Amino acid sequence: MQTQANKDQVLAYWAALDAAHADDLGAVCAAHLAPEFTWNGPAPMSLQTGPTAVSKVFWQPLKQAIPDLKREIHMVFAGASSGRADGGTDGETWVCGTGYLSGHAQGQFLDIPATDHPLRLRWGAFYKLRQGRIIECQMILDFVDWFDQIGLPVLPKSRGIAHVYPAPTGYDGVIRGPQDISQTAETLRMGRQFLYGGLNRYDASGLTSMGMADFFHPNVKWYGPGGIGACFSLTEFETLHQTPWLEAFPDRKVQTLDALIAEGALLGAAGVAGVCATHSGAYLTTPASGKPIAVSGLDFWLRQDDKFTENWVFVDMVDLFAQMGEDLFARLHQQIATRSARPQ
């Protein structure tokens, strides 16, 4: 089946990246990616076009900074996308995955200092394939969590628990064989209903207007990005994340997504501007700017019976805060300067 072949192709690309020396990564990208390949990476790198560009801008500098870089894969699955807000399919096929990149930074990457501190960097990625060729990637690396790991936080202490990002509980997230078609269809149906019939139903009268209890298990595990943290129940999720988020962005709406796929009990969503809103209230101490914002994010869910029991969440926080008028890399530089000025 094409779905399985697509996963094998992405897994082979990852294996080649992981095995290569930094100097050889350009050849690896050229061998595995289509010439017209586009990479929507996290800010400040953002959009890159062509295999050479993504190698030079991201993979080579990252591996030069972290020579012992290793990949831990928590999930890999694939499917045909159904991310249109009007309910239609878009005819595209995607493979998605997430996990950790781990190692010890021996050099700088994007001005992030080398500390030789053991790192576990959260990554998520979605790959679009056409006719067996990788033509697009949307990827987020959790920079805010990285900054926090090396003692240079750029946001207030997270309300949720920091640095929690496990593999799925009681479920093999690396799907290699065909899945029950009816289970896949049910996961996708629930995902669409959750996004467009639940989240988008918020009317500012209260959280219950979205009917979150219809979709999330009471003990849902919600693994948020750096700056937000993890929540270990629906009550914690609503209190620690959803309430502050909606106070800041009360008119937020899920848009047509670049990818919404399911395989078995796993669901994935990706959108470069997947949520649009107005920054109407303070968020993580950043005052309301009144500016329109577009949230770039990735999500992964695990369904058990009729509820989602786990949700792994990526938000491009550097891009989000830039739209609100705050430069998180400038905050990093300030933290570095402050630490350097301390008496040794």
Predicted ranges, named:
Residues M1-Q344:
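C-terminal and inter-domain tail/linker signature
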